[in-house]
């Protein structure tokens, strides 16, 4: 199929990495957004991974497992390390800026997390400053991380158990197991999965502008932006806060770009712009003379 051809030909890549010097880890650079191939490839890749006959059975469980695994093994671990560094260096004048930055980041991340898990509260944001941070603040943040960790451990275990139940239904005997293996082999593309899950990414989590960003499993990660902008391989996108499947969003964008290009060509917009620039250039030259 097309996904095998694309993956084997090394044509798959992250449009968010077009120029790492001027892009950020959260979204695709604007100049990447105007490439029709970006919208077309992402639509096909996401749909082929998420909606193939095998993956669509397990996708929601794997999404919950992926999100939980990232939070408890990368996100919380990174924040705990920063919290411990803050406690260690809080009175070190040479590291005052680093401590302030870490406290700012911890506060940002807790605020973001509270929009996802509303029932786990943290009410001491005013203590997350170099001037007010103390042992009480340290314990309160630690307690918050403990509760969030417990939440994601439970979420992971529930999703994993449900997935295992489903697999058991399809593998009741040796014959069924063989058929299940063949079924997966027919529909699940390992190379495409590596791209959509960003499995080869060395940095699983990165820090940028006072926040932490997930770099693995983009296919299981929903974007925060309320209007269209998203990381590459996002399974769905938000339009005015409403989630819509990536396939339909991207197809709509391709149609809009096509219609825009048609109008541009039909009314010779590009020619008129070039003619205008040429006239302006001639006027400037004449004024100099």
Task: List each language-model region with its residue ranges.
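Short, small-residue-biased leader/transition segments that mark boundaries at the very start
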Residues: 1-8
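Extracellular/luminal re-entrant pore-loop and selectivity-filter region at the outer mouth
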Residues: 9-279
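Non-transmembrane, juxtamembrane loop and terminal tail segments
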Residues: 280-289
